[in-house]
Amino acid sequence: MVVSLSLHASSSIRKSKTKASLCLDSLPEDLLVEISSCTGASSLSAVRNLRLVSKSFRRICDEKYVFYRLSLKEIEFLPWHENSAKFIERCTESRNPEALFQKGFINYFRDKLQDRGLEYLAEAAEKGIKEAKYVYGVILICLGGKTKQKGFEILSSVIKQLMSTTMNELVEFRYKIQKIRYGFWWSDNTVVEQLKTAYVSEKCKCDCKTRMLLLVMNRGWYLFGDETDLDFSSACELYLYINRNFPFEAKKSKIDGEIYWACEFEPNRFVRTEPNRGLDKSVRLRLIEYNRSVSV
């Protein structure tokens, strides 16, 4: 009697699974694609499990659109296994934004394929990958010339309403890039040295009286962790661009945040001031003008 009940229960489970599978397979294909792509965008592990549900899902999960939306956060940035590398390559061919950023970063800094790397980074930045915007923007600024202004414009897209929030996010980007760097770079990386050499410091309009440090805790605007990457003029220049362009377009809230600037008599020591103090007069007046034009 017990054996009979067990067999009956097992048979019922198999039938219910078969019925569920048949119901899913009967859904329109475009709906299956949307389900698969949304699942993949949230978790790579989840889409792997989805492939086991039915033959239809296994086939749909191989669609280019699903690969385009896949989240790659569960995969190491520089995959050493051949299967993982092939998987990333397939994602790149599907124009997956995260894969494009990885490909561009590796091409530019490790493989020394700068032109191709910049193309991938540009596409990833255009598709909304913030880390790609950060790296691509800084590279363009370093290269100078006509690309410099474009670099500032790209970096301005990651700026938040509050300056302190912006600094925190830039710090986060910096450490993310630094972590990637430790994965495959070495101390005498020639590409980074070329970027440092290529950057031409231009005297900003405030004569560097505004020595804004975009990274808090007395740490300057370092490109890849080296204190000599960029000098104060570039930090000042970027700060001027942020406060003369972005806020006037946004017009949502007052400029706020901690401002670090160089002491006049002790240039190697940095002090925290109240917002808008220690600034060149023209910049300070511009900020006052803006803050009066908006309501908090």
Curated annotation (Swiss-Prot):
Residues 21-70 form the F-box domain. InterPro entries: At1g67623-like, At2g35280_TPR_dom, F-box-like_dom_sf, F-box_dom. PROSITE patterns: FBOX (PS50181). Gene3D superfamilies: 1.20.1280.50. Coiled coil: none annotated. It holds the Pfam family F-box. This is Putative F-box protein At1g67623. It comes from Arabidopsis thaliana (Mouse-ear cress). The lineage of its organism: Eukaryota, Viridiplantae, Streptophyta, Embryophyta, Tracheophyta.
